[in-house]
C-alpha cells in the first residue's frame, strides 16, 4: 500500500481488506521503487493524474488506483453504487445531485462517469470557481442554485470542502459557503423523503454539511465506510484471482 498523499480512512480500509482476505499487507514509503517490490498487488494513491496508469505499465503487480490527483477514485465509486443498491435503489432513472468542489474532486468525476453510465440523471451545483469549465460535457445538468440541484433528488453526494481552497480565494469564506451551498435540514426537505445522503469523508460539519444532516436517518455516510472494506475485499479478490472459483466463496 503506497500513499504519496495521506488518507487515514482509505488506508485503514485497504489494510483491513487485505487482512480479512488472509493476506499480508505492508505500507511502504514512496522512496521504494515499483520495480523492486515483490508483491502481488499495489494499492497506490498519488497526487498526479495518470500515476496509476503509468505504474501499471512499468510494474508487474496488479495496480489498484486509490486515487490519482483529481482524476479518479474507482473504489469509492464502487462502494457508493453498492451503498445505493443496498438500499434497494436501481440507479437507472434516479436523480443524483453532486454538490460542492467538483473541480478538484476525483470522487465527483468517478461518480459522474459511473452514474451516467448506469442511466442516472446527474445534477451538480457549487461555486463557479469550483466547477470544471467543461462540466456540461460530462453529461450532467449544471445549476447555479443548490436548491434546484437537490429538488426531488434520490441521492445527494456532498463533497468535502478543503479549506485551502478558501485561502486561494475560490470562495469568500466558510460561513458564506455554508450559507449558499451547505446542505442543512431545510434544504434536505427539498429532496425525496427517502433520499440517500452520501459523503466521501471526512465531513466538515457546519460547512458543506450540517451536523443534523450528517447524522440523520437518510445519511448513509457511516455505511459507506463499512461498505468500503467489503468492496475493497471484493476488488482485491477479483484482481488477484481473476474471478476464478468465485462460486466457492460464501
Residue ranges and their predicted role:
Residues 194-250:
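Adenosine-phosphate binding glycine-rich loop
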Residues 2-27:
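Low-acidity, Ser/Thr- and Arg-rich intrinsically disordered low-complexity segments
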Residues 67-72, 127-129, 224-228:
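Short, acidic/turn-prone active-site loops that include or flank metal/cofactor-
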Residues 58-60, 118, 136-139, 193, ...:
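Short, structured coil segments at secondary-structure junctions
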